[in-house]
Regions:
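GST-like domain detector, emphasizing the conserved glutathione-binding G-site
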Residues: 2-10, 17-80
């Protein structure tokens, strides 16, 4: 089952970098939204998740926070 995934991040965030490095190491292409460069992305993160916290993986529009939880999700549901 294919899910719609989007990673909300900030380039300077070490936890975001951890998730992006995991994605790169496993050849995962997930759309990224930089909340520092894209005010609309920041607004959506606040509106849907109720807070501005990154990294945040939206899974079919539902937010998942915390880098370790995101990596666990990716390794279980996305990695081949």
């Amino acid at each position: 089952m294919n899910r719609q995934l989007t990673l909300y991040h900030m380039p300077s965030c070490p936890y975001c970098l951890k998730v992006r490095r995991y994605m790169e190491a496993h050849d995962m292409e997930i759309p990224l939204r930089d909340i520092t460069a894209d005010p609309a992305a920041r607004d959506q993160l606040q509106r849907v998740g109720g807070k501005v916290q990154v990294p945040c993986l939206f899974i079919d529009g539902t937010p998942l926070y915390e880098s370790d939880d995101i990596i666990t999700y990716l390794s279980t549901h996305v990695a081949s």
